[in-house]
Amino acid sequence: MDTWHDALGGEKQQPYFQEILNAVRQERLSGQIIYPPEADVFNAFRLTAFDRVKVVILGQDPYHGVGQAHGLAFSVRQGVRIPPSLLNIYKELETDIEGFSIPAHGCLTAWAEQGILLLNTVLTVRAGQAHSHALLGWERFTDTVIRQLATHRKHLVFMLWGGYAQQKGRLIDSQNHLILTAPHPSPLSAYRGFFGCRHFSQANSYLSQHGIEPINWKL
């Protein structure tokens, strides 16, 4: 199994998946603003090939502010203000990875292109309404993504931040992969253990131990 089509082609033919796409399409047609833009919904899969995934960072649902979401968890486009959770991720990187300095932007495309799957478990959201698409059925699809990676790939690093993401640990065999857990990097919880978790250096150590080129976290 080498491609997302191999892993997910059958899933995309399922009635529930077509129902999700139709529901989102109908909302857009009715004038509701949905993020990310239609062309960006599956960006994470476009930028990170199935057979090149090294690290999976799970988010919840896309940013719901104007111009923020572009299909990669935690990431925003160039020129958009860095959101607080991402700024805290950068702060942890600054203390964890030698030579990392906080960039002036929040675009994580360079990570995605190195094999970091930046996966939101819900792939769309209404403007200004967090979790508004939580019940559309996206999680059935993204659970399959996690399960397929965990089953058909070896020695991946899964970063599960916050209780919501940590629930997905049940889909992953810890004998074959490294599961790293910590509180969410949001300002509400980062000081409860996200800061100091050193997940980024741990990920690189694990990858190196298994003969896999480590991530260059610098942006």
Swiss-Prot record:
One of its GO terms (biological process) is base-excision repair, AP site formation via deaminated base removal. The active site is at D61. Keywords: Cytoplasm, DNA damage, DNA repair, Hydrolase. NCBIfam families: PRK05254.1-1, PRK05254.1-2, PRK05254.1-4, PRK05254.1-5, ung. Belongs to the uracil-DNA glycosylase (UDG) superfamily. UNG family. It catalyses: Hydrolyzes single-stranded DNA or mismatched double-stranded DNA and polynucleotides, releasing free uracil. Gene3D superfamilies: Uracil-DNA glycosylase-like domain (3.40.470.10). One of its GO terms (molecular function) is uracil DNA N-glycosylase activity. InterPro entries: UDG_fam1, Ura-DNA_Glyclase_AS, Uracil-DNA_glycosylase-like, Uracil-DNA_glycosylase-like_sf. Pfam families: UDG (PF03167). It is found in: Cytoplasm. Its EC number is 3.2.2.27. GO terms for cellular component: cytoplasm. It comes from the Bacteria. Its main location: cytoplasm. Excises uracil residues from the DNA which can arise as a result of misincorporation of dUMP residues by DNA polymerase or due to deamination of cytosine. It is an enzyme of class 3 (hydrolase). This is Uracil-DNA glycosylase.
